[in-house]
């Protein structure tokens, strides 16, 4: 029977979800994850605890538009029309309500602490059984690892408590509410609460019980908290494991705590003590606490490179050894400190190869499973990442255990963001919001402080700088001086951060924003009195086809010791799967669910697609972050290791010399390089090529044996050098055939054997080619100066809010997309051994000339068409996206073969990872399926391209696919693209960079813009 005080009406009347002073009711204090083993061996080996029971699975669910619409009867029994949903899940992924994607703008009217009356509410219920043994002694808790955004809990019709902060556990004591046998839980989840104002992160806004739910049985007298810390002497040869243990329950003299440290099957150290803490002040110490210190000789240190772990088992027992319960955690012996302006791990300066990671799954929303977490970690390690920032909230508890074990440095970030507030620190400088902020910071620290992978605490993200930040910074430094604290808000270098941690600061360019200037990272280091390390909390915005200029950051990181790396934004595209009317899945972004407000495709900034398929940019990141660097001098290769702790015990260096992709010599040498060491490798006398071509030396570091995170044969690093070649000239063989020119009223036609070329005299374009009777072109060969806009070209521009500074808006305003060709010249001449076509076009818009393109086409007796192109660019038109040619080939071949940079997509400012070789790929692999279609698939540095019967030679860039630039530009989602007839070929003499320092302002560096007034390129086109 529901008591009056437990009634839904009474609970709703309090409106706890609109009171920033109420962040919880009856919630238990935060602590590390517990399992309450009753066998110390099971604790040591981390076996499943019999005292920990999952409640994940099918729950009954009913959705209402507001909490007031929930009937009182729901507390007692399931509603007749209730559905069944899986917990954990987001209810939006089950068709209830709509997910909302917004970056800065709050999804609700900003009126803190109040939320809309229309507040979608999910009512969950579960019937489960409890064994009598759990009720006879001890305490039964329920743990909700994550509920968004706030919830009330009832058990057997009685109100238990309230919780908010969607990214940390809410734990309640159910002991007084349970009875043996069948019990019923009722959980009312509200989509919006005052806590939503602190959760304005750039992500999908979803709701529900989206993390694990479990029951935990603890003894009446129990371990209520424990903290482990490692300390060292100067040379790390001796360590102390300090364990502070706190108990709850009857404090009896016979109680003891034993802490034992294990390395595998070996007990390294152990200590036992009664309760009674060290003296704190004149009143004494804590009677319910004890601190034990275990000495460890020559500890094996933990790092992301070598994640050595011990296991600490904490036993609560009586004096005669009777075990009451045991808790345990992995222990990594490591020290983090800042000294002389450097962030040090175990005395060595770190170089952070980091990435920001949202918890996102394309099918399950914000629900994370172990398989996906492990997949992310393996991909990060395989691509030379060593650090991850939990952006922008504490992650699933299992994530930290996996980072401990596989080896990743973690920035653990509080679930605080008020980006949409004006000013941004409106709440964070308001003392009424300090309790809510405090809970989010302190509970994160209390949950995660035993993880060695957590090396930095973060106070949150994009919330300005307020007095509350200063207070919480001081609290962390007081309770956990073993880790630095970072916080970007307020300018990235306030008193609330130990690390200068800007976002999207550029290498050499200042961004003098009012109040919070964003200096170049080089300048920041030299500001008067500034001696902190600089680690970019976000940089290299990887939205769509991006990450241009990434190499420039890494050049600076390696040049300036206090520039200690950064965290790329971000790891995974946040697209969600929807289904069309035929049941086919497609990738959706902001606005596709009818969600308003929305920020469209801005949710897709990942180095990997939502299904974890890599973007081409991931290879660039891997290459720039590689742990081996190479220098070539003569025939000597100098290999430098950037590992701080790891000796190269699983690496071979494979080298190969190739002429135009044909191997001439190769070899393999084992690497024997110590941490931060060097190895010189002398190559044998290299063979001299007998023919013309490009001679390249390629080195690759290969791991012959599988590791915990990679398969055997994994390539971890590589480099290429172009070698000097002998001068060699291959003269064309004489041809007795002479192409024949005929002229009609509309065309010039050239014929040679079974080949014909047709130039339209009115347009001046190559309008058709024949091989035998087969036409080769579906569209004429024309100049091309534009590209389907990248996200970086678009910036923040949209239909209702034009940004005139965005590249695409400049190109549109100047008429680049609408330019039409005015023919200035089209002549044909018969030479002694060839036919020469000469054309000139003025590309104009509204009477203004933007480009003048002059071409000659020389068709010789071998059937080769040599195209020379000279382009003049108007001085007052924006720098073009490309200078090249385009046509639609009639042929559709299965494969593309080219000699140039590859195999992955590459662009002028993102090509350091590409290698020069002869590549052969399916046509479908030449297209990169960005969810928001754009220019894609370029391959630079190309000397030869083979496709179907066609061969192109020169020095050019190309992309080739079934989609035109026009279709890419006009299509909003990749699943709406349709394969066009034939194949679209774009061959560029020059192509602008793609940028990527950020995606909302022009970020293509000057050296990668097409800023010259005149351009020339040459191309040879023939048929095989």
UniProtKB/Swiss-Prot annotation:
<keyword id="KW-0378">Hydrolase</keyword>
<dbReference type="InterPro" id="IPR011013">
    <property type="entry name" value="Gal_mutarotase_sf_dom"/>
</dbReference>
<dbReference type="GO" id="GO:0000287">
    <property type="term" value="F:magnesium ion binding"/>
</dbReference>
<dbReference type="GO" id="GO:0004565">
    <property type="term" value="F:beta-galactosidase activity"/>
</dbReference>
<feature type="binding site">
    <location>
        <position position="417"/>
    </location>
    <ligand>
        <name>Mg(2+) 1</name>
    </ligand>
</feature>
<feature type="binding site">
    <location>
        <begin position="538"/>
        <end position="541"/>
    </location>
    <ligand>
        <name>substrate</name>
    </ligand>
</feature>
<dbReference type="GO" id="GO:0009341">
    <property type="term" value="C:beta-galactosidase complex"/>
</dbReference>
<dbReference type="InterPro" id="IPR013783">
    <property type="entry name" value="Ig-like_fold"/>
</dbReference>
<feature type="site" description="Transition state stabilizer">
    <location>
        <position position="358"/>
    </location>
</feature>
<feature type="binding site">
    <location>
        <position position="103"/>
    </location>
    <ligand>
        <name>substrate</name>
    </ligand>
</feature>
<dbReference type="InterPro" id="IPR023933">
    <property type="entry name" value="Glyco_hydro_2_beta_Galsidase"/>
</dbReference>
<dbReference type="Pfam" id="PF02836">
    <property type="entry name" value="Glyco_hydro_2_C"/>
</dbReference>
<comment type="similarity">
    <text>Belongs to the glycosyl hydrolase 2 family.</text>
</comment>
<dbReference type="GO" id="GO:0030246">
    <property type="term" value="F:carbohydrate binding"/>
</dbReference>
<dbReference type="Pfam" id="PF02837">
    <property type="entry name" value="Glyco_hydro_2_N"/>
</dbReference>
<dbReference type="InterPro" id="IPR023232">
    <property type="entry name" value="Glyco_hydro_2_AS"/>
</dbReference>
<dbReference type="InterPro" id="IPR008979">
    <property type="entry name" value="Galactose-bd-like_sf"/>
</dbReference>
<feature type="binding site">
    <location>
        <position position="462"/>
    </location>
    <ligand>
        <name>substrate</name>
    </ligand>
</feature>
<feature type="site" description="Transition state stabilizer">
    <location>
        <position position="392"/>
    </location>
</feature>
<dbReference type="GO" id="GO:0005990">
    <property type="term" value="P:lactose catabolic process"/>
</dbReference>
<dbReference type="InterPro" id="IPR004199">
    <property type="entry name" value="B-gal_small/dom_5"/>
</dbReference>
<dbReference type="InterPro" id="IPR050347">
    <property type="entry name" value="Bact_Beta-galactosidase"/>
</dbReference>
<feature type="binding site">
    <location>
        <position position="202"/>
    </location>
    <ligand>
        <name>Na(+)</name>
    </ligand>
</feature>
<dbReference type="InterPro" id="IPR006104">
    <property type="entry name" value="Glyco_hydro_2_N"/>
</dbReference>
<feature type="binding site">
    <location>
        <position position="605"/>
    </location>
    <ligand>
        <name>substrate</name>
    </ligand>
</feature>
<protein>
    <recommendedName>
        <fullName>Beta-galactosidase</fullName>
        <ecNumber>3.2.1.23</ecNumber>
    </recommendedName>
</protein>
<feature type="binding site">
    <location>
        <position position="202"/>
    </location>
    <ligand>
        <name>substrate</name>
    </ligand>
</feature>
<keyword id="KW-0326">Glycosidase</keyword>
<dbReference type="InterPro" id="IPR006103">
    <property type="entry name" value="Glyco_hydro_2_cat"/>
</dbReference>
<dbReference type="Pfam" id="PF02929">
    <property type="entry name" value="Bgal_small_N"/>
</dbReference>
<keyword id="KW-0460">Magnesium</keyword>
<feature type="binding site">
    <location>
        <position position="1000"/>
    </location>
    <ligand>
        <name>substrate</name>
    </ligand>
</feature>
<dbReference type="InterPro" id="IPR036156">
    <property type="entry name" value="Beta-gal/glucu_dom_sf"/>
</dbReference>
<feature type="active site" description="Proton donor">
    <location>
        <position position="462"/>
    </location>
</feature>
<dbReference type="InterPro" id="IPR006101">
    <property type="entry name" value="Glyco_hydro_2"/>
</dbReference>
<comment type="subunit">
    <text>Homotetramer.</text>
</comment>
<dbReference type="InterPro" id="IPR006102">
    <property type="entry name" value="Glyco_hydro_2_Ig-like"/>
</dbReference>
<dbReference type="InterPro" id="IPR014718">
    <property type="entry name" value="GH-type_carb-bd"/>
</dbReference>
<feature type="binding site">
    <location>
        <position position="598"/>
    </location>
    <ligand>
        <name>Mg(2+) 2</name>
    </ligand>
</feature>
<keyword id="KW-0915">Sodium</keyword>
<keyword id="KW-0479">Metal-binding</keyword>
<dbReference type="InterPro" id="IPR023230">
    <property type="entry name" value="Glyco_hydro_2_CS"/>
</dbReference>
């Amino acid at each position: 029977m529901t008591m009056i005080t437990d009634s839904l009406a009474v609970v709703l009347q309090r409106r706890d979800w609109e009171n920033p002073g109420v962040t919880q009711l009856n919630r238990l204090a935060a602590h590390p994850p517990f399992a309450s083993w009753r066998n110390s061996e099971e604790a040591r080996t981390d076996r499943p605890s019999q005292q920990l029971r999952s409640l994940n699975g099918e729950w009954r669910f009913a959705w209402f538009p507001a909490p007031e619409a929930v009937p009182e009867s729901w507390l007692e029994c399931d509603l007749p029309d209730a559905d069944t949903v899986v917990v954990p899940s987001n209810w939006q992924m089950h068709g209830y309500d709509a997910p909302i994607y917004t970056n800065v703008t709050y999804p609700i009217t900003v009126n803190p602490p109040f939320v809309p009356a229309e507040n979608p509410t999910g009512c969950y219920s579960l019937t489960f059984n409890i064994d009598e043994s759990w009720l006879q002694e001890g305490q039964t808790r329920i743990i909700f690892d994550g509920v968004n955004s706030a919830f009330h809990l009832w058990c057997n019709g009685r109100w238990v408590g309230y919780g908010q902060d969607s990214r940390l556990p809410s734990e309640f004591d159910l002991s007084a509410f349970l009875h043996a046998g069948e019990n019923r839980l009722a959980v009312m989840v509200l989509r919006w609460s005052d806590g939503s104002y602190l959760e304005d992160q750039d992500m999908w806004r979803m709701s529900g019980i989206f993390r694990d739910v479990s029951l935990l049985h603890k003894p009446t007298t129990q371990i209520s908290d424990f903290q482990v810390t490692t300390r060292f002497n100067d040379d790390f040869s001796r360590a102390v494991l300090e364990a502070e243990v706190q108990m709850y329950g009857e404090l009896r003299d016979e109680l003891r705590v034993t802490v034992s440290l294990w390395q595998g099957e070996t007990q390294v150290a152990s200590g036992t003590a009664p309760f009674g803490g060290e003296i704190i002040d004149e009143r004494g110490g804590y009677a319910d606490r004890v601190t034990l210190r275990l000495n460890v000789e020559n500890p094996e240190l933990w790092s992301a490179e070598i994640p050595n772990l011990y296991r600490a088992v904490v036993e609560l027992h009586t004096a005669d050894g009777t075990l009451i319960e045991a808790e345990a955690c992995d222990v990594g012996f490591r020290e983090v400190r800042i000294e002389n302006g450097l962030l040090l791990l175990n005395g060595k300066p770190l170089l952070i190869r980091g990435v920001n990671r949202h918890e996102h799954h394309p099918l399950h929303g914000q629900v994370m499973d172990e398989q996906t977490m492990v997949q992310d970690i393996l991909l990060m390690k395989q691509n030379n990442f060593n650090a991850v920032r939990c952006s922008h909230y504490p992650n699933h508890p299992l994530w930290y255990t996996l980072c401990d074990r596989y080896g990743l440095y973690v920035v653990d970030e509080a679930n605080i963001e008020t980006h949409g507030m004006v000013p941004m620190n409106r709440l964070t400088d308001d003392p009424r919001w300090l309790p809510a902020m405090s809970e989010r910071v302190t509970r994160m620290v209390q949950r995660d402080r035993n993880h060695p992978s957590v090396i930095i605490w973060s106070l949150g993200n994009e919330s300005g700088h307020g007095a509350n930040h200063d207070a919480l910074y001081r609290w962390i430094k007081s309770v956990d001086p073993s880790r630095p604290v970072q916080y970007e808000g307020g300018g990235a270098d306030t008193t609330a951060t130990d690390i200068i941690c800007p976002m999207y600061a550029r290498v050499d360019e200042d961004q003098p924003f009012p109040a919070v200037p964003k200096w170049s990272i080089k300048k920041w280091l030299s500001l008067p009195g500034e001696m902190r390390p600089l680690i970019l909390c976000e940089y290299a915005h990887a939205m769509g086809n991006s990450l241009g200029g990434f190499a420039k950051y890494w050049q600076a990181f390696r040049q300036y010791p206090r520039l200690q790396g950064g965290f790329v934004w971000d790891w995974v595209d946040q697209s969600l799967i929807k289904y069309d009317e035929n049941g086919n899945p497609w990738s959706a972004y902001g606005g596709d669910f009818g969600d308003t407000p929305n920020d469209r495709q801005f949710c897709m900034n990942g180095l990997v697609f939502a299904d974890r398929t890599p973007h081409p940019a991931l290879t660039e990141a891997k290459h720039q972050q590689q742990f081996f660097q190479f220098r070539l001098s003569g025939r000597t290769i100098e290999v430098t290791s950037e590992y701080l702790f790891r000796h190269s015990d699983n690496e071979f260096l494979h080298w190969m010399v190739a002429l135009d992709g044909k191997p001439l010599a190769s070899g393999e040498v084992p690497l024997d390089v110590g941490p931060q060491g060097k190895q010189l490798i002398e190559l044998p006398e290299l063979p001299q090529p007998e023919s013309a071509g490009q001679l390249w030396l390629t080195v690759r570091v290969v791991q012959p044996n599988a590791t915990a995170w990679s398969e055997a044969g994994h390539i971890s690093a590589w480099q290429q050098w172009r070698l000097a070649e002998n001068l060699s000239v291959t003269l064309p063989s004489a041809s007795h055939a002479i192409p024949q020119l005929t002229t009609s009223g509309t065309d010039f036609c050239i014929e040679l054997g079974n080949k014909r070329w047709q130039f339209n005299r009115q347009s001046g374009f190559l309008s058709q080619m024949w091989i035998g009777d087969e036409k080769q072109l579906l569209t004429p060969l024309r100049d091309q100066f534009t590209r389907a806009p990248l996200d970086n070209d678009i910036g923040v521009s949209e239909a209702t809010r034009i940004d005139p500074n965005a590249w695409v808006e400049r190109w549109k305003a100047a008429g680049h997309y609408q330019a039409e060709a005015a023919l200035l010249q089209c002549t044909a001449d018969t030479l002694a051994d060839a036919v020469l076509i000469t054309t000139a076009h003025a590309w104009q818009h509204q009477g203004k000339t933007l480009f003048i393109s002059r071409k000659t086409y020389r068709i010789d007796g071998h059937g080769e068409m040599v195209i020379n192109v000279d382009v003049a660019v108007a001085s007052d038109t924006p720098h073009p996206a490309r200078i090249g040619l385009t046509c639609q080939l009639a042929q559709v071949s299965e494969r593309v073969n080219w000699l140039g940079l590859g195999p992955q997509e590459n662009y002028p400012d993102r090509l350091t990872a590409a290698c020069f070789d002869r590549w052969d790929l399916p046509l479908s692999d030449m297209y990169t399926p960005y969810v928001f279609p754009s220019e894609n698939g370029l391959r630079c540095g190309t000397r030869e391209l083979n496709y179907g019967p066609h061969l192109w030679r020169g020095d050019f860039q190309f992309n080739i696919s079934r989609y035109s630039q026009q279709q890419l530009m006009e299509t909003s989602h990749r699943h709406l693209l349709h394969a066009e007839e034939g194949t679209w070929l774009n061959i560029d003499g020059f192509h602008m960079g793609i940028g990527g320092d950020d995606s909302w302002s022009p970020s293509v560096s000057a050296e990668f813009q097409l800023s010259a007034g005149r351009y020339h390129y040459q191309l040879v086109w023939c048929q095989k």
